[in-house]
Amino acid sequence: MLTKAPRGTKDILPSESYKWQYIEGLIREICDVYGFKEIRTPGFEHTELFLRGVGESTDIVRKEMYTFTDKGGRSITLKAEGTSPAVRAFIEHNLYAETQPTKLYYITPVYRYERPQSGRLREHHQFGVEIFGAKNASADAEVISVAMTLLKKLGLNNLELRINSVGCPVCRKNYNKVLKDFLKDNLEYLCDDCKVRYEINPLRVLDCKVESCQRITKDAPLITDYLCDDCKSHFEELQKYLDIMGYDYIIDPRIVRGLDYYTKTAFEIISKDIGAQGTVCGGGRYDGLIEECGGPSMPGVGFGMGLERLLLTLEQNGIEIPKPEGIDLFIAYVGEEAKLFTFALANKLRFNGLKVERDNMDRSLKAQMKYANKLNAKFAIVIGEEEMKENKVKLKNMRDGSEVEISIDEIEQRIKNI
């Protein structure tokens, strides 16, 4: 067991990590141009945060959280999702007292005890954005635009944006009554989870993936028919913003998301080429969450995107992440004096920004050059006693085999100019 990672976790090796670095770099670029600032929250929180924030009727709270009692007797839970910790930090550090809105993003590991499957692990990584303090539907459209921009820049074009409004506490109260009346005659046929949802948050029965529950709910009354004037106006406004950006979308009354805190907007982005595993992003508005977690009454909207699922989607669509270029220079050496000299030279060139490698295995010159090829070096030099004495080396272009004699002092500038 010491040499095997726990079930539901995965090592990201150098052969894969470049893909993560590429996506994370693109995320940071996009968030920067949209004005989002990075936030980093702890890997664990007080359990109450998720109970109040995520909702006690959710699968996350009821089945999936990693919760333990620490040595101080406190109930602690590993980060199960990114929004609630961001809200907690927003409140704790009085960010609500600053000029609003507050626009945050994060890339973070999250932990859920669920059955490991393709694109879904017990430790996975989530990219999310949050806008706190903006009630206008333009904020909803903006977070959707961030997600769509990322996916399109990665080459995913066959996307389907599905939107819904789940209302507010006022209109949802009326709808919940209508929905419960509709469901009560078939209550015995609902799955065990939905029987619990029926009592606590009946709206979430619509989110169930169990076939028997879907058959029952396919003719359920639509929440969009029960929206109050404010929620209806907000939903119509969102559609205007999506229209002006040129985004196609489908109004799907079944989109309610798996967390209890959503109000008004709920959305999902689906890669149509994948099918059941095709949801790559989901989010929405949560106007009561900040107050529920102990802060002032302020609105919020955001999304979460699983990076493992995103990478799987790219792979299944045949989209390859660009591999990093090879190193700039490999320095081979012959002799003990050159061994020390090239160590110092490599260190100097690295300090000045060149990607440089040299041999640390005491290989023969032939083996060193073979190693340079394996590292995909752009250039190579060989330094021995004569090169040190003359202060000159032959700079070899490893792509075409051409060589040019230059002074050792010229190496850095010559490579940077090519």
Swiss-Prot record:
GO cellular component, one term: cytoplasm
Sorted UniProt keywords: Aminoacyl-tRNA synthetase, ATP-binding, Cytoplasm, Ligase, Nucleotide-binding, Protein biosynthesis
MF annotations from Gene Ontology: ATP binding; catalytic activity, acting on a protein; histidine-tRNA ligase activity; transferase activity
A biological process term (GO) from this entry: histidyl-tRNA aminoacylation
InterPro entries, sorted: aa-tRNA-synth_II, aa-tRNA-synth_II/BPL/LPL, Anticodon-bd, Anticodon-bd_dom_sf, His-tRNA-ligase, HisRS-like_core, HisRS/HisZ, HisRS_anticodon
Reactions listed under catalytic activity: tRNA(His) + L-histidine + ATP = L-histidyl-tRNA(His) + AMP + diphosphate + H(+)
UniProt-annotated location(s): Cytoplasm
Pfam families membership: HGTP_anticodon, tRNA-synt_His
EC number: 6.1.1.21
Binding partners and assembly: Homodimer.
Family classification: Belongs to the class-II aminoacyl-tRNA synthetase family.
Protein name as annotated: Histidine--tRNA ligase
Organism in which the protein naturally occurs: Thermoanaerobacter sp. (strain X514)
